[in-house]
């Protein structure tokens, strides 16, 4: 059975209440946020607030597939946030494709695929993204990139492959939607690759359970939460928003 976790809609409610009650947390840069500590929910929708940016999601996926640790290799214009967190050489830690496919990180995808292929009931089907040396690697050569995803565990139950995502930190608006798209891609690929290895398996993608140490909304996106609280709509452009967080 899947734990009776919260849903994305319930996460919206908790964040909406935090904003209404002005339960603010100031981050290391002095920016106001609202936050859920120890958030755990079933990721049953591809975004929480805002709207999907399919064009960027595809560009980021292509970069992940390349396994490049340099932001210049992101197809198209390099997003400002990646430029800001990169080292003086334009290098980062958080290419998630590198994290699961590179031999330098012990081929996490292949290890997980082999484990689940040999033992479908295993609790060892895990992809480890981060590493102990991240404590020092995050600020190498002027970088500011402490990987947000710790691990993703895959559990096969009742012919469904469930993903349990474990993160230290996740931005609700930009972070979640892009990370969800990546995790859905990896889950679907794992299902396909396991089925290709044995036609009798006939696995399907199950639930994605999302566990986050700090799930937060930055003040620049408070207007989205406020708009949802008033209307139930998850997105509005800032120019069309009317309210105290304009």
Curated annotation (Swiss-Prot):
MF terms (GO), sorted A to Z: deoxycytidylate 5-hydroxymethyltransferase activity
Enzyme Commission code(s) on record: 2.1.2.8
Record key words, sorted: Transferase
TM helices/strands, residue ranges: none
Catalytic activity: dCMP + (6R)-5,10-methylene-5,6,7,8-tetrahydrofolate + H2O = 5-hydroxymethyl-dCMP + (6S)-5,6,7,8-tetrahydrofolate
Keyword match Transmembrane: no
Enzyme class, broadest EC rank: transferase
Catalytic residues, chain numbering: 148
KW Transferase (keyword) present: yes
Protein name: Deoxycytidylate 5-hydroxymethyltransferase
UniProt source species: Enterobacteria phage T4 (Bacteriophage T4)
């Amino acid at each position: 059975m899947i734990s009776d976790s919260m849903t994305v809609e319930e996460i919206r409610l908790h964040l909406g209440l935090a904003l209404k009650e002005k339960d603010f947390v100031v981050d290391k840069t002095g920016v106001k946020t609202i936050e859920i500590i120890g958030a755990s929910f079933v990721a049953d929708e591809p975004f929480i607030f805002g709207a999907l940016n399919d064009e960027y999601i595809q560009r980021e996926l292509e970069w992940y597939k390349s396994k490049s640790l340099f932001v210049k290799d992101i197809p198209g214009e390099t997003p400002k946030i990646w430029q800001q967190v990169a080292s003086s050489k334009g290098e980062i830690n958080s290419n998630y494709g590198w994290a699961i496919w590179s031999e330098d990180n012990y081929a996490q995808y292949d290890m997980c695929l082999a484990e689940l292929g040999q033992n479908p009931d295993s609790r060892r089907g895990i992809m480890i993204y981060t590493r102990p040396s991240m404590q020092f690697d995050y600020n190498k050569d002027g970088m500011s990139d402490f990987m947000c995803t710790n691990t993703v565990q895959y559990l096969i139950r009742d012919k469904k492959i469930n993903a349990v995502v474990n993160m230290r930190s996740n931005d609700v608006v930009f972070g979640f939607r892009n990370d969800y798209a990546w995790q859905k891609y990896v889950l679907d690929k794992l299902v396909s690759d396991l089925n290709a290895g044995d036609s009798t398996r006939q696995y399907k993608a199950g639930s994605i359970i999302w566990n986050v140490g700090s799930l937060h909304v930055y003040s620049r996106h408070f207007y989205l939460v406020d708009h949802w609280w008033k209307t139930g709509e998850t997105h509005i452009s800032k120019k069309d928003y009317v309210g105290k967080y304009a």
